[in-house]
């Protein structure tokens, strides 16, 4: 009898335990044992009410920089020289149309989309804003590539990074431009896509440099690289991106020299601290042979960065460098130690797929948001392993579509702001959908 009673109590206890576990499972407390739910891409909806119409008959140019400040207001760096004569007819005296006029290169929007400030630096590429009210702009001014620090409110130039007195032959000057005060009223440029027309269209070969001119150019490039080797501790090529790591008092610049160099400077003194290339190559190890930068879509990855390098720094101190022309992202420590390589949309040719790098707004920054200039998507990647979770957007000129998706920024609430070049030439906003 004693044994039977003991067995009965054991069965009762077993049933109770099973029931208790069922309750726990129903409450979701055993999810960790069953495995966490699969990460999914976030959803967003286009906000047609942001921004408000621009004042002063301005028409914005292509967006080459985008940043959100500590108050979740938005700074947009645009390229007024993208505008053509037909877009500047209100500047003529007398005007021959109701619109439009050249805008300043830097425009400040509040959360409601109103313009609350502006100033007019030489147009550039890449920007960041700090918590003290300063803007850092990568630009090309009179053939010199650099990063300049400005007072956001007054537009006063405060300081600039050390840079060479000249740029590589034929490289990096496309984002330069005069101030509005130097602009001839009513006279625009060739348009935002003129420099991107491929040499062969419809089987017709467009004009190419003569063999003699090509030989002379290669000789000039070789001489320049001997004068300014990869170890040059200053900005040499055009700037593609600027990022700040304020806790570490450091500024990161993506220098497009030799396909791309990650260059780190002291945020307070602008003194050079360190730099590296693809796969964590020391500056002294970066190749000057262009064959080491060659890339064919779906082919092997080049030994060095291919070009149009952008970057960002996560809260946990990892540096994500997007090599757009090679459809890949490299992950480093702050000291340049190579950790991982993520490949994305490797079939993409022309302008490449891996553009700007942003992070999801959660504390862990679990996701990467990658802007894609060529395919006109924002890709959502798992930050840990680079797995593509989804995408947003398609090519088009309607609201919520993209034509030349170039820049992105994310505010503290997870709202995505985008900026376009080419025929897009606008900023848009996308609200998270829960």
PLM regions with names:
Residues 1-9:
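N-terminal secretory signal peptides that target proteins for export/translocation
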Residues 8-17, 24-434:
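Eukaryotic scaffold repeat domains enriched in small/polar residues
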């Amino acid at each position: 009898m004693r044994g039977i009673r003991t067995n009965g109590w054991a069965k009762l206890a077993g049933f109770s335990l099973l029931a208790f576990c069922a309750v726990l499972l129903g409450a979701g407390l055993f999810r960790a044992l069953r495995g966490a739910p699969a990460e999914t891409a976030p959803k967003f909806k286009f906000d047609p009410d942001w921004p408000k119409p621009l004042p002063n008959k301005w028409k914005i140019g292509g967006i080459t920089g985008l940043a959100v400040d500590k108050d979740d207001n938005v700074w947009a760096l645009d390229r007024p020289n993208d505008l053509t004569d037909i877009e500047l007819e209100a500047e003529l005296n007398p005007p021959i149309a109701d619109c439009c006029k050249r805008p300043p290169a830097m425009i400040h929007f509040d959360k409601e989309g109103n313009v609350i400030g502006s100033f007019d630096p030489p147009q550039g590429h890449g920007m960041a804003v700090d918590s003290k009210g300063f803007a850092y702009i990568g630009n090309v001014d009179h053939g010199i590539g650099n990063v300049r620090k400005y007072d956001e409110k007054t537009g006063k130039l405060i300081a600039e990074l050390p840079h060479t007195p000249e740029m590589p032959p034929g490289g990096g000057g496309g984002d330069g431009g005069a101030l509005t005060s130097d602009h001839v009223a009513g006279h625009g440029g060739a348009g935002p896509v003129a420099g991107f027309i491929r040499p062969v269209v419809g089987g017709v070969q467009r004009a190419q440099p003569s063999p003699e001119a090509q030989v002379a150019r290669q000789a000039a490039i070789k001489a320049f690289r001997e004068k300014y080797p990869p170890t040059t501790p200053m900005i040499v090529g055009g700037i593609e991106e600027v990022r700040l790591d304020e806790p570490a008092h450091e500024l990161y610049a993506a220098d497009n020299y030799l396909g791309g160099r990650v260059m780190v400077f002291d945020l307070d003194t602008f003194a050079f601290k360190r730099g590296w290339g693809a796969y964590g190559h020391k500056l002294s190890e970066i190749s000057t042979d262009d064959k080491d930068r060659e890339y064919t879509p779906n082919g092997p990855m080049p030994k060095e960065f291919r070009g149009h390098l952008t970057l960002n720094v996560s809260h946990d101190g990892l540096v994500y460098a997007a090599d757009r022309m090679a459809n890949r992202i490299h992950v480093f420590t702050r000291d340049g130690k190579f950790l991982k390589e993520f490949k994305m949309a490797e079939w993409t040719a022309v302008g490449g797929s891996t553009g700007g790098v942003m992070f999801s707004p959660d504390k862990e920054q679990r996701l990467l948001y990658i802007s894609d200039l060529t395919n006109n998507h924002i890709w959502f990647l798992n930050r840990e392993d680079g797995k593509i979770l989804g995408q947003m957007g398609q090519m088009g000129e309607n609201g919520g579509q993209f034509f030349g998706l170039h820049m992105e920024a994310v505010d503290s609430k997870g709202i995505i702001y985008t900026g376009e070049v080419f025929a897009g030439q606008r900023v848009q906003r996308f609200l998270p959908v829960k």
